[in-house]
Amino acid sequence: MPVLQWGMLCVLSLLLSIGFLAVHLPAALLLGPMIAGIIFSMRGITLQLPRSAFLAAQAILGCMIAQNLTGSILTTLAVNWPIVLAILLVTLLSSAIVGWLLVRYSSLPGNTGAWGSSPGGAAAMVAMAQDYGADIRLVAFMQYLRVLFVAGAAVLVTRMMLGDNAEAVNQHIVWFPPVSINLLLTILLAVVAGTVGCLLRLPSGTMLIPMLAGAVLQSGQLITIELPEWLLAMAYMAIGWRIGLGFDKQILLRALRPLPQILLSIFALLAICAGMAWGLTRFMHIDFMTAYLATSPGGLDTVAVIAAGSNADMALIMAMQTLRLFSILLTGPAIARFISTYAPKRSA
């Protein structure tokens, strides 16, 4: 029964999250549900998170990001615009080269390999890939596999950088603060702005519109965004389930042949982004944790959750991640067409 299966998923997610919190792992409330979802998927238990729940979680995350966006971040980006532009261009070029090599040296069709290797929002890439005739199940597998490895790598980097401070971050959590009018206004903001983002059909619009609207309203002192930990935990759980349940045993079997090349492409992209993060620490004089999360190849919501569980500069991270997302969305179709047309196929 679906109700029983959802109950079992909730229990397993809770147990894993508590375990991760006990060892002071960043983004424990994301990793627990994500791993639980993967376990269920690999055992052939088919559960699908309602789309409304995922969109609501994205809207809540958008409000969380808005809490940390200030006018100073625009100044930082403007002062360092050559570096920011270089990071975006290298990301686009790297994804194009990795996608080209993946199609060239694997059995993946051109469209599928191109869209699957694009470091944009996973959900957005899957939706756009469908419009361009790619195998969306393979694209989804590749995208969520990338998100899984990106999340794991980001959590490890964050944990290593925090060191003994990881325990202090977790100890400051207040799960059930008193309910105030600010919470009600924040939920209203999430509902209204999230609905607008959904109606506009923007990729990740249910996160981006609340993020922008919340930042404007809070900077104008019209609202004070308040998000208790219990509400954020629910949003993290929905995001984790979306990733974990996105894996499919049948599609995994189908992807076994090109899996080594897929993994190699993911690791190559991670290595390139880590190199860019090191460059950011040298030229922008920021800590490596902030630089790594800012250049990490998505997804936007996953990086936001991990950044929230650390002492990183959330505003800079989200500004860089949003710019990367839009640049990929704008150039993705052209890059995919180029790879599909010109990447030579290996003879069978």
UniProtKB/Swiss-Prot annotation:
Seems to be involved in the regulation of AidB. GO terms for cellular component: plasma membrane. The keyword Transmembrane applies. It holds the Pfam family AbrB. This is Putative regulator AbrB. The gene is abrB. It is found in: Cell inner membrane. The chain crosses the membrane at residues 20-40, 59-79, 83-103, 138-158, 173-193, 196-216, 221-241, 259-279, 288-308, 315-335. It comes from the Bacteria. It comes from Escherichia coli (strain K12).
